[in-house]
Amino acid sequence: MTVSDRWLLPDGVEDILPPLAGRIESLRRDVMDTCQRWGYQLVIPPLIEYLESLFTGTGHDLELQTFKLTDQLTGRMMGVRADMTPQAARIDAHTLGQDGITRLCYAGHVLHTRPRHMLTGRTPIQAGCELFGSGSEAADMEVISLMLETLRVAGLPRLHLDLAHVSIYESLVSDAGFDRDTEAAVFDAMARKSVPELDRLLGECVPGSAGFRLRQLARVSGGVESLADAREILSGASGAIDAALDQLARVADMLNRDFPEVSLGFDFCELRGYNYHTGLVFAAYVPGHGDAVAKGGRYDAIGSDFGRARPATGFSLDIRALVSLGERPFRKAGAIWAPADNDARLEGVISGLRMTETVIRALPDDRETDPSERGCDRQLVNRDGQWVVETIA
């Protein structure tokens, strides 16, 4: 093994150094403080769990993203968490077991087998909130509003929010009666927004059929006006689709009222999380970045696998990515340099200052250190027997 092999990190894995580490931690604290001011209680799930609980209700995508290992105590397969949402659902359904509304928030590292996008690598710092026990639109609005507030705290300008509803695609596919291979191919083409491929797969579908509506729907996206286009395409399709469109319209009206500065859009090809989302889904974007900076939605069925079905909605985001994209000012106050003198009065002054300030104490063998190189803009100086703080010239 060469010397370089000893310090080389795996692809997509990085050390986070000062001052970036300080900016990330500052935002993490502010995001969690914001969530807790909205009534969300902090939970700290374990880094590893048995695969059965990590994959509950999440579909195949999360399994591909999860590092797996064998438990040396039991021989069972375990996984390093790739998403904390299933863990929060387990805590609500089984560990807490509360009736009524439960609000939980979390923040911590997750590990992915492959990077999802260039800003995160394979070790994102995920934060999120989950609201359990309410299937109301008010709960959906609370979660979306909190997500937008956390993005404001992160200093993200000019937000765009896309809304979608899983029931629309789900109902059309059910009515179409595709075989398994065709359904998988249509899903893949819709997720990639490949209109030519959908035309090839569904080109023989007659007007008015579910397949024909899917082809037309893939061409619809944009602002509030696109909702009217979708209504025209989906007119008479099913009661479930009408209800989903009505809900999208109501939520859009509330968002326009409460967040007029956020541009709204509808993306009827949005299928991320289709395997576990059950209703309204949403994703926030910023100009110049193609991936969502935060996303979430309703997932009412996931708790049933833990023995207690509960309506649920929530969102998650990556703190590391937000720091890279945001315009949040970060200015760490300068520290105070204290000499290495063995003086009881100096010890008392340092102890008092450390209640509110950062004090860096010199060591006997670093008397030549320049305090400004250690981030100090002030120093403790003995003036007539009194230790006072003075600005470093």
From Swiss-Prot:
Pfam families: tRNA-synt_His
A single GO molecular function term of this UniProt record: histidine-tRNA ligase activity
Gene3D superfamilies assigned: Bira Bifunctional Protein, Domain 2 (3.30.930.10)
Pathway assigned in UniProt: Amino-acid biosynthesis; L-histidine biosynthesis; L-histidine from 5-phospho-alpha-D-ribose 1-diphosphate: step 1/9
SUPFAM superfamilies: Class II aaRS and biotin synthetases (SSF55681)
InterPro entries per record: aa-tRNA-synth_II/BPL/LPL, HisRS-like_core, HisRS/HisZ, HisZ
Keyword Transmembrane annotated: no
CDD domains: HisRS-like_core
GO annotation terms (biological process): histidyl-tRNA aminoacylation; L-histidine biosynthetic process
GO cellular component: cytoplasm
Subcellular location: Cytoplasm
UniProt entry keywords in alphabetical sequence: Amino-acid biosynthesis, Cytoplasm, Histidine biosynthesis
Subunit structure: Heteromultimer composed of HisG and HisZ subunits.
Note: This function is generally fulfilled by the C-terminal part of HisG, which is missing in some bacteria such as this one.
PANTHER family the record matches: HISTIDINE--TRNA LIGASE, MITOCHONDRIAL-RELATED (PTHR43707:SF1), HISTIDYL-TRNA SYNTHETASE (PTHR43707)
Protein task: Required for the first step of histidine biosynthesis. May allow the feedback regulation of ATP phosphoribosyltransferase activity by histidine.
Name of the protein described by the UniProt record: ATP phosphoribosyltransferase regulatory subunit
Name of the encoding gene: hisZ
